[in-house]
Amino acid sequence: MQNSQLFTESLPKHIAIIMDGNGRWAKSKGQPRVFGHKKGVSAVRKTIAAASKLNIQAITLFAFSSENWRRPEEEVGLLMELFITVLSSEVKKLHKNNLRLRIIGDTSRFSERLQKKIVEAQELTASNTGMVINVAANYGGKWDITQAVQKVAQQVALGDLSAEDITEDDIAKHLTMSDLPEVDLLIRTSGECRISNFMLWQMAYAEMYFTPVFWPDFGEESLIEAITWFVNRERRFGCTGEQIKALMSAQ
C-alpha cells in the first residue's frame, strides 16, 4: 500500500463539530451576541471548504440544540432569521460544488417558512455525491435515540419484531444518520470540554478534540491542527500539518 493511500485512509471519515463561543467572541469585541453568530457563518464556510478538499465523507455541525430554546426570545428569533438567510444564500453554492446538505433534528418546531427552506435546500442537493453536510438543528442525542427506540417499539407492537430479538443494529438503523459512518472525530471550540447531548450514540468511539479557539476564529488552519492530532493519536501514523496541506492541494 502506498504511503499516500495509507495516510488518506487514516483521515477521519465523519467529523462532528460543536461550534461554541460565538457569544463570548462577540463580547470580547464589544459587540452583541448576534454579531458572533453572523461571524460564525464565515467559519462554517471555511471549515466546509477545507473538509471537502480532504474528501472527508461527512461533517456534522451542531447549530442549534433542543436546549437552545431556553435562550432569550430575541436571540432565538435572530438565530432563526439567520438560518433562513444562510439557507437562501449558501445552498446554491453547495449544490454547485456537489455537496449534499441535510438538516438533522426535530424541525417541526420551526416556522413554516423555515421548514419550507429546509425542504427546498435538501431536495436541491439530494442527488449530489460529494461530502455530506449535516446541520443539527433542534437536535439532541437523547431525542435521536428516543425516536429510534419508538420506531423499534412500533415494530414490536405490529409483531414484526420480538422484544427479545432487539439488537443494537435495530436501534442504530433508525437513528438520523444511520447511513453514515459513526463519528471518528469530535471537535469542540471555545475551551469547553463536554459533549452537550450531541450525537450520544454515534460518538461512542470518537476521539474528542477540545480547542480554546472561539468558533468565529476557527478555519482551515484550525481544522488541519485537529485532523493532525487525530491522525497521530488514533491511527499511530506520524504526520504533520504540512502533509495534510499538501494533500488538500493535490485534490
From Swiss-Prot:
Question: What GO molecular function terms would the record report?
Answer: ditrans,polycis-undecaprenyl-diphosphate synthase [(2E,6E)-farnesyl-diphosphate specific] activity; magnesium ion binding
InterPro entries on file: UPP_synth-like, UPP_synth-like_CS, UPP_synth-like_sf
Positions with a binding annotation for Mg(2+) = 20, 207
> Is Magnesium a UniProt keyword of this protein?
yes
Chain sites annotated for binding substrate? 21-25, 33, 37, 65-67, 69, 71, 188, 194-196
Question: SUPFAM superfamilies from the xrefs?
Answer: Undecaprenyl diphosphate synthase
Q: Which GO terms describe its cellular component?
A: cytosol
Q: What is its EC number?
A: 2.5.1.31
**Free-text cofactor note:** Binds 2 magnesium ions per subunit.
Its UniProt entry gives the catalysed reaction(s) as: 8 isopentenyl diphosphate + (2E,6E)-farnesyl diphosphate = di-trans,octa-cis-undecaprenyl diphosphate + 8 diphosphate
The active site consists of: 20, 68 (proton acceptor)
Tell me which Gene3D superfamilies the record gives: Decaprenyl diphosphate synthase-like
Essential cofactor(s):
Mg(2+)
Q: What quaternary arrangement does the UniProt entry report?
A: Homodimer.
Function as written in the Swiss-Prot or TrEMBL entry: Catalyzes the sequential condensation of isopentenyl diphosphate (IPP) with (2E,6E)-farnesyl diphosphate (E,E-FPP) to yield (2Z,6Z,10Z,14Z,18Z,22Z,26Z,30Z,34E,38E)-undecaprenyl diphosphate (di-trans,octa-cis-UPP). UPP is the precursor of glycosyl carrier lipid in the biosynthesis of bacterial cell wall polysaccharide components such as peptidoglycan and lipopolysaccharide.
Among NCBIfam families, the record links this protein to: PRK14830.1, uppS
Which family is this sequence assigned to?
Answer: Belongs to the UPP synthase family.
Q: What is this protein called?
A: Ditrans,polycis-undecaprenyl-diphosphate synthase ((2E,6E)-farnesyl-diphosphate specific)
